[in-house]
């Protein structure tokens, strides 16, 4: 299994995001809300939504890079065949400077592993 994050594994179209927001199921913990929906493909696709309230662009971009990296490096444990949207919660925004990558990885992977159709 390749560890790249290819173009086909990204959610890019507005209609894909809207469909997940409208028809998707959700899981959440103190740091993230994960919305997901079956996509009928043999691989999962990832989208990330970070509000401006999260902080300046550098903070938002850093979080998005971390989430993409977690997805990319852990494809083997994430269920296949889902469109997934990750949304950070306010608590993560407040604690972001004090939380390290490994804590965020653990919290996000716990949610992603619980995805089921």
Swiss-Prot record:
Keywords, ordered alphabetically: Endonuclease, Hydrolase, Nuclease, RNA-binding, tRNA processing
Record carries keyword Hydrolase: yes
InterPro entries: Ribosomal_Su5_D2-typ_SF, Ribsml_uS5_D2-typ_fold_subgr, RNase_P, RNase_P_CS
EC number(s) from the headed UniProt entry: 3.1.26.5
BP terms from Gene Ontology: tRNA 5'-leader removal
Xref: Gene3D superfamilies: 3.30.230.10
Reactions performed catalytically: Endonucleolytic cleavage of RNA, removing 5'-extranucleotides from tRNA precursor
A molecular-function term among this protein's GO annotations: ribonuclease P activity
Function: RNaseP catalyzes the removal of the 5'-leader sequence from pre-tRNA to produce the mature 5'-terminus. It can also cleave other RNA substrates such as 4.5S RNA. The protein component plays an auxiliary but essential role in vivo by binding to the 5'-leader sequence and broadening the substrate specificity of the ribozyme.
Superkingdom as given in the UniProt entry: Bacteria
Keyword set includes Nuclease: yes
GO cellular component term, pick one: ribonuclease P complex
Upper taxonomic lineage: Bacteria, Thermotogati, Thermotogota, Thermotogae, Thermotogales
Record note on quaternary structure: Consists of a catalytic RNA component (M1 or rnpB) and a protein subunit.
Record-given protein name: Ribonuclease P protein component
Family statement drawn from the similarity comment of this UniProt entry: Belongs to the RnpA family.
EC category: hydrolase
């Amino acid at each position: 299994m390749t560890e790249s994050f290819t173009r086909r594994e990204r959610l890019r179209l507005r209609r894909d995001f809207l469909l997940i927001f409208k028809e998707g199921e959700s899981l959440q913990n103190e740091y993230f809300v994960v919305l997901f929906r079956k996509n009928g493909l043999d691989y999962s696709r990832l989208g990330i939504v970070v509000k401006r309230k999260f902080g300046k662009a550098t903070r938002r971009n850093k979080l998005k890079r971390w989430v993409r990296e977690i997805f990319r490096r852990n494809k083997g444990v994430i269920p296949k065949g889902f469109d997934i949207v990750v949304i950070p919660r306010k608590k993560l925004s407040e604690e972001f400077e004090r939380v390290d990558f490994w804590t965020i990885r653990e919290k996000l992977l716990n949610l992603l592993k619980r995805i089921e159709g």
